[in-house]
């Protein structure tokens, strides 16, 4: 069976990193449906962790628990612990505003706000901080530079973000997320709606962003997981089957289910 090539890890990638996010005996329910089953996983700091598996396996559900976005919807319940810097974010005592500023999220489809490019990035900052006009301008510029978009939009910050291309809109969404200076960046299939050139640019951006952020990415594209991630977790039917360094998952998986999935026998 065909195996997926994984780029050789650098010394920085193979060095042990502290744990940034950890799930402990995590279960999740959509009403009575048991969607995630006793998940235990540690996400290392300033590394890219990819979540892979067939549709409906629980990848995006796990991602949404990491910033409690599920709490916006009725009849959803998480049990267990999710620790961010050793604090349980599932505790009712953990402030939601604090969580939103520490954990950013980018979705599958670019969703720019119907406002100017500048205001798209400034919007979240205004809700969390009071900055002078000069500081806000510097903050927006820095975020757009981190989103690899500044050079393309610096002369049209007052124009509508809806006029940007799909790839530019997704990079704007990334800039908007990092503008709050989060610790963790969650990416839910961020390139699935983009063309190959835009996809390549986002992948390059992920590599650059991990210098400053802990990144968790959900992807159906195993080649993408192999290219961008340091660690990979394979999920199936709500279970975490295997989690290891990406090169190990794709070259020497310890579980037969993982082997079958990455070689295309199912999924």
Swiss-Prot record:
It catalyses: phosphate(out) + ATP + H2O = ADP + 2 phosphate(in) + H(+). It is found in: Cell inner membrane. InterPro entries: AAA+_ATPase (IPR003593), ABC_transporter-like_ATP-bd (IPR003439), ABC_transporter-like_CS (IPR017871), P-loop_NTPase (IPR027417), PstB-like (IPR005670). The keyword Ribosomal protein does not apply. Gene3D superfamilies: P-loop containing nucleotide triphosphate hydrolases (3.40.50.300). GO terms for biological process: phosphate ion transmembrane transport. ATP binds at residues 53-60. It comes from the Bacteria. One of its GO terms (cellular component) is plasma membrane. One of its GO terms (molecular function) is ATP binding. Pfam families: ABC_tran (PF00005). It is a peripheral membrane protein. Residues 21-262 form the ABC transporter domain. Its EC number is 7.3.2.1. Belongs to the ABC transporter superfamily. Phosphate importer (TC 3.A.1.7) family. Part of the ABC transporter complex PstSACB involved in phosphate import. Responsible for energy coupling to the transport system. PANTHER family: ABC TRANSPORTER I FAMILY MEMBER 17 (PTHR43423), PHOSPHATE IMPORT ATP-BINDING PROTEIN PSTB (PTHR43423:SF3). The complex is composed of two ATP-binding proteins (PstB), two transmembrane proteins (PstC and PstA) and a solute-binding protein (PstS). This is Phosphate import ATP-binding protein PstB. It comes from Xanthomonas oryzae pv. oryzae (strain KACC10331 / KXO85).
């Amino acid at each position: 069976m065909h195996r997926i090539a994984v780029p050789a890890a650098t010394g920085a990638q193979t060095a042990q990193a502290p744990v940034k996010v950890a799930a402990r005996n995590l279960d999740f329910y959509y009403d009575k449906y048991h969607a995630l089953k006793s998940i235990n996983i540690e996400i290392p700091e300033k590394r890219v962790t990819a979540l892979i598996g067939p549709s409906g396996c629980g990848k995006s559900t796990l991602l949404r628990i990491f910033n409690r976005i599920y709490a916006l919807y009725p009849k959803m319940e998480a049990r267990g612990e999710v620790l961010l810097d050793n604090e349980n974010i599932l505790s009712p005592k953990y402030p939601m505003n604090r969580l939103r500023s520490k954990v950013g999220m980018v979705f599958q489809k670019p969703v720019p706000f119907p406002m100017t490019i500048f205001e798209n990035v400034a919007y979240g900052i205004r809700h969390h901080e009071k900055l002078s006009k000069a500081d806000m301008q510097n903050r927006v510029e820095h975020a757009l530079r981190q989103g690899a978009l500044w050079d393309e939009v610096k002369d049209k910050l007052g124009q509508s973000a809806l006029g940007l291309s799909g790839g530019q809109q997704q990079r704007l969404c990334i800039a908007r997320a990092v503008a709050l200076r989060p610790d963790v960046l969650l990416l839910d299939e961020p390139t699935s709606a983009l063309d190959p050139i835009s996809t390549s640019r986002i992948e390059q951006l992920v590599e650059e962003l991990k210098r400053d952020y802990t990144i968790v990415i959900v992807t159906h594209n195993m080649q993408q997981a192999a290219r961008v991630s340091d660690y990979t977790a394979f999920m199936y039917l709500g279970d975490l089957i295997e989690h290891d360094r990406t090169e190990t998952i794709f070259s020497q998986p310890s579980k037969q289910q993982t082997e079958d999935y990455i070689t295309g026998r199912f999924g």
